[in-house]
């Protein structure tokens, strides 16, 4: 039995890898730059976490969202794996302290946003770390043709100059051929091994419902499926109004949109993650990296901006492999 499989069983309690997790892990362990295009819920995180545990040193994870970083760090810590994140609310003194601890080998995973790489002093400190792998979350953000372009992602390629022999692993769930090529070019990946998996999610059922009364229809759906749900709307006003209407009907709902203060976003997210709120009513600000296995229903009551957003948002459902809508 491989060491990678033993770690999967020990920390994640899964008996076997999904296709093509094991091949991706081996590619990284062989020192290759690697690009993984896997569907939402396809187990992308394990593809960098396991090789990072097998290699000496620390894994640097570049991630676009505070909520995503905190969720992954908490997930690793719950498995007794030492991880830390440089999030926006961390002071400069705390950053220095965290980086010192990374240098002394007290952490296996360091998460940070791409914007942190715009600070020269942080990059200088990173150069002193024994980095064994650089993992890029939501890699489509590096492409101007992607649906969530973040200019700061273009700074990641500079790490290649400092760590020419350290493997890069770029991961995303949404990238057409043009975006894939852009990712590999903009991240300066060297002869990357490319892995893709079918985007068919057998456990997801898609429905288009015609109705004159959306709220009544939502009430029916949520009553029939009382498990965790997400409702996507196009703007903040609809977000607040829909949540208020649901609460008046006796459902427990909370909201998430770009205009909320960070603390309120975190509080609402936690309420939903802990199933204190059945329904999260959200704009597309609530999207990348949200990994809650038991989401039963994702409802779009207004059209999303594009098909990529729809695929990502609908893909929040059924990550535990059970039937979802």
Residue ranges and their predicted role:
Residues 1-4:
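Accessory DNA-binding and partner-docking regions appended to nucleic-acid-acting proteins
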């Amino acid at each position: 039995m491989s060491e990678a499989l033993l770690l999967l069983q020990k920390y994640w309690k899964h008996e076997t890898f999904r296709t093509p997790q094991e091949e991706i892990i081996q590619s990284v362990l062989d020192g290759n730059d690697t690009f993984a295009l896997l569907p939402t819920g396809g187990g992308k995180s394990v593809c960098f976490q396991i090789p990072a545990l097998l290699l000496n040193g620390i894994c640097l994870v570049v991630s676009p969202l505070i909520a995503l970083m905190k969720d992954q760090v908490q997930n690793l810590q719950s498995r007794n794996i030492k991880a830390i994140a440089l999030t926006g609310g961390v002071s400069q003194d705390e950053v220095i302290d965290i980086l010192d601890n990374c240098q002394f080998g007290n952490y296996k995973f360091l998460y940070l946003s791409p914007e942190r790489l715009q600070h020269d002093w942080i990059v200088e400190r990173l150069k002193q770390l024994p980095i064994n792998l650089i993992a890029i979350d939501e890699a489509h953000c590096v492409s101007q043709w992607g649906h969530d372009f973040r200019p700061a992602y273009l700074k990641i390629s500079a790490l290649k100059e400092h760590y020419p022999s350290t493997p890069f692993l770029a991961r995303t769930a949404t990238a057409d051929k043009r975006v894939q090529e852009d990712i590999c070019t903009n991240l300066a990946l060297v002869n990357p091994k490319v892995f893709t998996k079918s985007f068919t999610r057998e456990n997801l059922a898609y429905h288009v419902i015609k109705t004159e009364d959306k709220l009544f229809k939502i009430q029916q759906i949520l009553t029939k499926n009382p498990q965790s749900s997400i409702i996507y709307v196009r703007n903040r006003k609809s977000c607040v109004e829909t949540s208020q209407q649901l609460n008046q009907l006796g459902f427990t709902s909370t909201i998430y949109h770009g205009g909320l203060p960070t603390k309120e976003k975190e509080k609402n997210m936690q309420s939903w993650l802990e199933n204190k709120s059945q329904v999260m009513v959200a704009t597309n600000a609530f999207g990348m990296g949200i990994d809650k296995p038991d989401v039963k229903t994702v409802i779009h009551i207004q059209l999303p901006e594009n098909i990529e957003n729809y695929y990502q948002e609908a893909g929040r459902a059924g990550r535990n492999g059970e039937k979802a809508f």
